[in-house]
């Protein structure tokens, strides 16, 4: 509905503010889909619980390390903060000894943020989008006819059909 309202405002020449979407998003594919479905109006994705969890896990790991009581689910990945947090060495290289005083909750949050960043970059590269503002609704297709009808995103069996037929019938100059 927000996208439809923004479309109507734009069609009337009204100013459309940058919009943000919230609602249980937790992974990079969620972020990509929100930005694509809301393009060009949605510029941000709000994440609440998804960001709190790695912070709380990091805080718990810090407590367990101090108590020398790491659960097996954590100790299978390492026995120190350097081994458990994949981005710890990066922070240590950037901030030196100061990184040793960083709360592990913050390091957990940073590590999760880096995972989101790299994953989003990979999805964007795969879809040939090298800037956030180039992501668009044309980067998506609906898996069901009902989803296509509701969203206005082309159904998977129809998406890029004309382009494919043109290549088949007329050939392709660049291959």
Region annotations inferred by a language model:
Residues 53, 80-175:
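C-terminal extensions of enzymes
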Residues 1-85:
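Glycine-rich phosphate/ribose-binding loops and adjacent secondary-structure elements
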